[in-house]
From Swiss-Prot:
Annotated InterPro entries: PsdUridine_synth_cat_dom_sf, PsdUridine_synth_TruA, PsdUridine_synth_TruA_a/b_dom, PsdUridine_synth_TruA_C, TruA/RsuA/RluB/E/F_N
GO MF term (any one): RNA binding
Pfam families recorded: PseudoU_synth_1
Subunit: Homodimer.
Family under the similarity heading: Belongs to the tRNA pseudouridine synthase TruA family.
Keywords: Isomerase, tRNA processing
HAMAP family (alphabetical): TruA
Designated name of the protein: tRNA pseudouridine synthase A
Catalysed reactions listed for this entry: uridine(38/39/40) in tRNA = pseudouridine(38/39/40) in tRNA
Active-site residue numbers: 52
Enzyme class: isomerase
Job of this protein: Formation of pseudouridine at positions 38, 39 and 40 in the anticodon stem and loop of transfer RNAs.
Length: 249
């Protein structure tokens, strides 16, 4: 029995998220069907981040166990021959038997894309939040800096979370201009349910002048979800990269 580690990218537009769901098409379901077609095994996929419906990934990490004779570094080629075009395995390798993509992660990086033009966003509608209002970028960046460090982020967690603690450490949170878009890049040791989308919605409120950057301190201190901004839609969110202890060796 070998544990196989995969690095994936996928367009989440046509999926009801990553995780298996009854009577719904998911990324995990497509992967497990492809594994079965190749090896006859009913593998169970474990992932680094269970992305929601409509959310995309450039650097999702998953693992599964297999008794197949397919070499670890050939799983990528084999799976890509069976997967739909909106899911691609970028790399594959055999890894240590105890490797867990979710719990072994040291840091996860997400990006949120905001399209900011007055005209209709025909080609961005499935891949970015479309904003037509002027945004104060300096104010948004000042607010983003306040989020850095280890803090209680309960105000940025959607209801229904199973988290035991609301403390997380944000290593960096910055905004950059990418053509007609604004990219929020955020890295942390972990994220709460809808945390990045709520942070994005809150920073947009700052950018629109709804409240000043320093108001973020009050939102954090309140530990009250109703004090933060709205949850940004899923299509602008991307899982960019996941870091593990072995990556620094």
């Amino acid at each position: 029995m070998s544990r196989i580690k995969l690095l994936l990218e996928y367009d989440g537009s046509n999926y009801h998220g990553f995780q298996l769901q009854k009577n719904a098409n998911t990324v995990q379901a497509e992967l497990e069907k492809a594994i079965y077609r190749l090896s006859g095994e009913r593998a169970t996929i474990v992932c680094a981040g269970r992305t929601d419906a409509g959310v995309h990934a450039w650097g999702q990490v998953v693992a599964f166990d297999s008794c197949s004779t397919i070499p670890g570094d050939r799983w990528a080629y084999a799976l890509n021959s069976q997967l739909p075009e909106d899911i691609q395995v970028l790399e594959s390798q055999e890894t240590r038997a105890e490797f867990n993509p979710r719990f072994d992660a040291l840091k996860k990086c997400y990006g949120y894309l905001i399209y900011r033009q007055k005209k209709k966003a025909t080609f961005y509608r499935h891949y970015a939040l479309c904003n037509t209002e002027p945004l104060k970028l300096e104010a948004m960046q000042e607010a983003a800096e306040i989020l850095k460090g280890r803090q209680n982020f309960r105000s940025f967690c959607a209801s229904g979370s199973s988290a035991r603690t609301f403390e997380r450490e944000i290593f960096h949170c910055r905004l950059s201009e990418k053509g007609p878009c604004l990219l929020l890049h955020i890295a942390a040791d972990g994220f709460l349910y809808n945390m990045v989308r709520i942070i994005t919605g809150t920073l947009l409120e700052v950018g629109k002048g709804k409240y000043p950057p320093q108001h973020l301190r009050e939102i954090i201190a309140s530990q009250d979800r109703t004090r933060a901004g709205p949850t940004a839609p899923p299509q602008g969110l991307y899982l960019l990269q996941v870091f593990y202890p072995e990556d620094s060796k």
